Amino acid sequence: MSIVIPNKDSLAVLRQCVDSILDKSTYDAYEIVIVENNSTEVETFAYYEEVAKDSRVRCVFFDGPFNFSKIINQGVEAAKGEYCILLNNDTEVITPDWIETMLGLCARQDVGAVGVKLYYPDDTIQHAGIGIAPSVAACLHQSLPRSDAGYFALNDAQQDLSASPLHA
């Protein structure tokens, strides 16, 4: 399992992201691949050296103008795992068995990709998948409080959806 995280000079959020993976994840057979994109802050590079002392973490360097797809693709190419999690650097792990849950869904023959529910710091939903209709695509359950089960309790259910977001 490889966790690919793009980054550019966002040390506070990157540190929180990486620390949450290392400290909270119960699955332990993973690597973290940080894809560096034109950072300029000395502290960022010092952190890369510090965190790379952990054998589960390494950095690769993307040299070129910002292009989210190319940055992610370089991280995936460098990844050694059978599966890849594409994770924004401002993400914090809150569920210890998140990797196991995703891998369990990936094992299904009818699944091509798996997404997770993302929350804003105020505990409202940022993303819970994308629903696609003939003339519209929409983020589901956006801005609902975590405690709101939603229509037919769909906010609390694992669902088969058409798309999962990944934003720059």
Question: How should each PLM-predicted stretch be described?
Answer:
Residues 91-135:
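Conserved donor NDP-sugar-binding/catalytic core segment of glycosyltransferases
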